[in-house]
Amino acid sequence: MKLLLFTALVLVVISLVEVEAENERACIPLEKECTKTPGNCCSGLKCDCYRRFEQGVAKGIQCWCIEKDVTYKGV
């Protein structure tokens, strides 16, 4: 009985460690593209999107993980 409980506990711990490691790998770091997965920026970051133009023609939307409290302005 003790062996069964110990084995179950070990399996639960291993599962939790694997899930946590998977979640850490899933986040997108600072200044990396998040167009397809806007909710996956790492902690403290937000996905900010911009419409891209080339010679006045819209070429799509691109999104990047940036710091939450930072505002960027064009020069």
UniProtKB/Swiss-Prot annotation:
Transmembrane regions listed in the UniProt entry: none
Cellular-component GO terms for this entry: extracellular region
Signal sequence segment: 1-21
Propeptide: 22-25
Expressed in which tissues: Expressed by the venom gland.
Localization (cell): Secreted
MF GO annotations: toxin activity
Keyword list, A-Z: Disulfide bond, Secreted, Signal, Toxin
Major localization class: secreted
Entry PTM: Contains 4 disulfide bonds.
Pfam family, one: Toxin_35
Family recorded in the similarity comment: Belongs to the neurotoxin 19 (CSTX) family. 06 (U6-Lctx) subfamily.
Protein's name in the database: U6-lycotoxin-Ls1d
